[in-house]
Amino acid sequence: MGSVSNQEITGGLPKSLDETADIHKSDESLIFQGSGVCKWFNVRMGFGFLTMTKKEGTDLETPVDVFVHQSKLHMEGFRSLKEGESVEFTFKKSSKGLESTRVTGPGGAPCIGSERRPKVKGQQKRRQKGDRCYNCGGLDHHAKECKLPPQPKKCHFCQSPNHMVAQCPAKASQAANLEEQPISEEQELIPETME
């Protein structure tokens, strides 16, 4: 039984197939210029899509989607894009479609980015209702993180040291008023404080 060498297989291909493979390989290595806007960007996953409206300075009849990864964004700090943000970019064709290789703002400026940040585990469930420190009343931390020594006990509703929240007259009077008139969501979340 004879064996067939690799030379015979590749040498046996018609020239047109070899040329087609070379053209496909060179097409993937070409870098193109484009501009458009951010279609969407997932800040938690770090990727999204751009809507290309111009290729090599020429308007496109129909917009084309181009994949973008956060590692390709030209900007300081946390890398992300805002929906609708104008961008200029270079891109290449890959086996998966069009992929950006570098993304900037107009004129090569840094990208603006999204105001959104991914939620960090532990902070998702925390501070949803305006939680405050039970020790000092601060809004920026909880009692276990408080830098002050333990404070005297006081009402968590009105901050008075004369009673606790269960016996708070301010809370009782507010509850009576609430039954009489409807309130907005803002009033519901922020209790009035007395000194």
UniProtKB/Swiss-Prot annotation:
Segments for region (Flexible linker): 107-130
Cross-referenced Gene3D superfamilies: Nucleic acid-binding proteins (2.40.50.140), Zinc finger, CCHC-type (4.10.60.10)
Keyword RNA-binding: yes
GO cellular component: cytoplasm; cytoplasmic stress granule; nucleolus; nucleus; P-body; rough endoplasmic reticulum
Highest taxon in the source lineage: Eukaryota
Alphabetized UniProt keyword annotations: Cytoplasm, Endoplasmic reticulum, Metal-binding, Nucleus, Repeat, RNA-binding, RNA-mediated gene silencing, Zinc, Zinc-finger
Binding site for Zn(2+) 2: C155, C158, H163, C168
Family listed: Belongs to the lin-28 family.
Official protein name in the record: Protein lin-28 homolog A
Species name: Xenopus tropicalis
Gene: lin28a
